[in-house]
Swiss-Prot record:
Protein name as it appears in the record: ATP synthase subunit beta
Keyword Ribonucleoprotein carried by entry: no
Role played: Produces ATP from ADP in the presence of a proton gradient across the membrane. The catalytic sites are hosted primarily by the beta subunits.
Principal cellular location given in the protein's record: membrane
This protein's UniProt keywords: ATP synthesis, ATP-binding, Cell inner membrane, Cell membrane, CF(1), Hydrogen ion transport, Ion transport, Membrane, Nucleotide-binding, Translocase, Transport
Its EC number(s): 7.1.2.2
Keyword Nucleotide-binding in annotation: yes
Enzyme class: translocase
Stored PANTHER family: ATP SYNTHASE (PTHR15184), ATP SYNTHASE SUBUNIT BETA, MITOCHONDRIAL (PTHR15184:SF71)
A single Gene Ontology CC term: proton-transporting ATP synthase complex
Binding-site positions, ATP: G153, G154, A155, G156, V157, G158, K159, T160
Subunit structure, interactors included: F-type ATPases have 2 components, CF(1) - the catalytic core - and CF(0) - the membrane proton channel. CF(1) has five subunits: alpha(3), beta(3), gamma(1), delta(1), epsilon(1). CF(0) has three main subunits: a(1), b(2) and c(9-12). The alpha and beta chains form an alternating ring which encloses part of the gamma chain. CF(1) is attached to CF(0) by a central stalk formed by the gamma and epsilon chains, while a peripheral stalk is formed by the delta and b chains.
Gene: atpD
NCBIfam families membership: atpD
Amino acid sequence: MSTAALVEGKIVQCIGAVIDVEFPRDSMPKIYDALILDGSELTLEVQQQLGDGVVRTICLGASDGLRRGLTVKNTAKPISVPVGKPTLGRIMDVLGRPIDEAGPIESDVTRSIHQKAPAFDELSPSTELLETGIKVIDLICPFAKGGKVGLFGGAGVGKTVNMMELINNIAKEHGGYSVFAGVGERTREGNDFYHEMKDSNVLDKVALVYGQMNEPPGNRLRVALTGLTMAEHFRDEGLDVLFFVDNIYRFTLAGTEVSALLGRMPSAVGYQPTLAEEMGKLQERITSTKKGSITSVQAVYVPADDLTDPSPATTFGHLDATVVLSRDIASLGIYPAVDPLDSTSRQIDPNVIGEEHYSITRRVQQTLQRYKELRDIIAILGMDELSPEDKLSVARARKIQRFLSQPFHVAEVFTGSPGKYVPLKETIRGFKMIVDGECDHLPEQAFYMVGTIDEAFEKAKKIQ
């Protein structure tokens, strides 16, 4: 469509990131149409039609300097972003424009960021396991290839570090394409991630889309859809894609920021009334079809460590595996701080993971649960008052707890200890030996921050 044919309107009101634009009554823009400010690259997205030719829009960029009377043009189509191989190795913003100063993106194919979720008969569920090399995840909450995983945790318990380690272990081993959407997170983390990918020579297989903390709410609200659109394109070409989102909570928060300005009545805890619908629209598109798969890992910030908060609670229902990071475990110095009693996976089924893996997982959880029940008694009366069986359970549980810790590759520069990738077979063998009592003679500190069980035996020799 030539620029001459674009219908023009005028800005009539600006309130923060929400802009009202008046158009001729016979040519009002549709919902989700992209409008462009005349003489600049600023894009507005239509959210509501208020009547009398006025539409209410969200500004995808800084609204500084906007005033009433400025001319806006209707592109008559939703926001479209470049997709395909030219996006790999590049950093883009919410509109698919490059922000890495490496020249334009030479892509002939663009795709609207608003797509329908695949039809029911196109879906292709999978039970194939995806090995991560992280003991606690592979044992307690294994991931399915083409599944959805959430990393839940409060501030500072290690969501981003866990996400980086998963990217390091899966994306490098995976060999396929990955898409990373940085939604409302720190710019520093985006920069670190870019250099991490560059140094490990996998940047040419990753598309990066950033809408960071310092950007207006419109950008943060839509950047997850931009990243997802790129991942969907690779999936529809028959590829297996990894899709990483950090952080889903900021996507919700951006919606909350603009919801009140759009004139909606807030619902529980001040969230937007459309929270479940917005989350559903995003999550239902992150799925595997008969053409290809999207395996997604999403970090989810938990406000005030409250998992019943509407935002994380709405996210739970969409996931195949939930990895819950606990402040209590982090305070013991055990990293990754995954709570083995709170984390779950739909793959924990003897028909999927096998009888041995299933029984070891359940025995590990039973031992830890027993220790949790006895902790109050130990705190009041001490260990001496416990029965011999309970003393043994506590000793094994403390060893399991320490053996669930593991040095990460991405944390090597901070900790000084080299990262460990532990194959699933080794993980199962190690925990089987602990619950079977084959390690009862070893000191518990031998299990802290090691990879396989053999390393624990070696460490015990050094300690003794």
